[in-house]
């Protein structure tokens, strides 16, 4: 079973993450940052990844440390749960519309982290949430998950819709990339023999 449990404790945050890559998309995420919890729920549900996240962070300062550190821990959990990546499809892509917004995600579970972020939020806030933290999450997640991750916005005027489209597109692309291909279930998806 492709599962992982990660704990990460610093002077700024105390985080636990549990994931099951072969789940049904159940989730129980409590970070103290309401909008971010909503985005994590979307990631779990649309990737069909069971996910439980707990974060106690220094929210009296701002949401930055909590959002970034959850991205770090979730990326570490993904890496652990994938193991040697035997049998996975490795690549995934999705163009996802959400009302006015359309965001494309293309990713490679290559072990070579890289983020291409071509997304612009028209507002600085979604409620009390700083929109710049969406990129911070994806940077941390890609770096610690070993993901080459490209997110490109083609349309959108509503920051909530743009952010949610980015999370959902990433989830759908992850779902495809993590799926085991029955034709190559015993093989590493690389001519190098490892990822």
From Swiss-Prot:
Pathway the protein takes part in: Amino-acid biosynthesis; L-histidine biosynthesis; L-histidine from 5-phospho-alpha-D-ribose 1-diphosphate: step 6/9
Keywords: Amino-acid biosynthesis, Cytoplasm, Histidine biosynthesis, Lyase
Matches recorded under Pfam families: IGPD
GO CC field: cytoplasm
Protein's GO biological process: L-histidine biosynthetic process
Class in the EC hierarchy, top level: lyase
Main location: cytoplasm
Full protein name: Imidazoleglycerol-phosphate dehydratase
Organism, as annotated: Jannaschia sp. (strain CCS1)
């Amino acid at each position: 079973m492709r599962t992982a449990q990660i704990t990460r404790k610093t002077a700024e945050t105390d985080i636990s993450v549990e994931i099951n890559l072969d789940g049904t998309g159940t989730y129980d995420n409590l970070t103290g940052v309401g909008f971010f919890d909503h985005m994590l729920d979307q990631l779990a549900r649309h990737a069909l990844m069971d996910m439980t996240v707990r974060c106690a962070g220094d929210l009296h300062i701002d949401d930055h440390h909590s959002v970034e550190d959850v991205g770090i821990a979730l990326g570490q959990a993904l890496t652990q749960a994938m193991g040697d990546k035997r049998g996975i499809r490795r690549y995934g892509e999705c163009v996802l519309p959400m009302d006015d917004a359309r965001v494309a995600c293309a990713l490679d579970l290559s072990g070579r982290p890289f983020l291409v972020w071509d997304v612009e939020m028209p507002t600085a806030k979604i409620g009390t949430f700083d929109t710049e933290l969406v990129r911070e999450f994806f940077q941390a997640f890609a770096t610690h998950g070993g993901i080459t991750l490209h997110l490109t916005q083609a349309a959108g005027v509503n920051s909530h819709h743009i952010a949610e489209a980015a999370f959902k597109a990433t989830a759908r692309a992850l779902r495809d990339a993590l799926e085991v291909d029955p034709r190559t279930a015993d093989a590493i998806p690389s001519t190098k023999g490892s990822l």
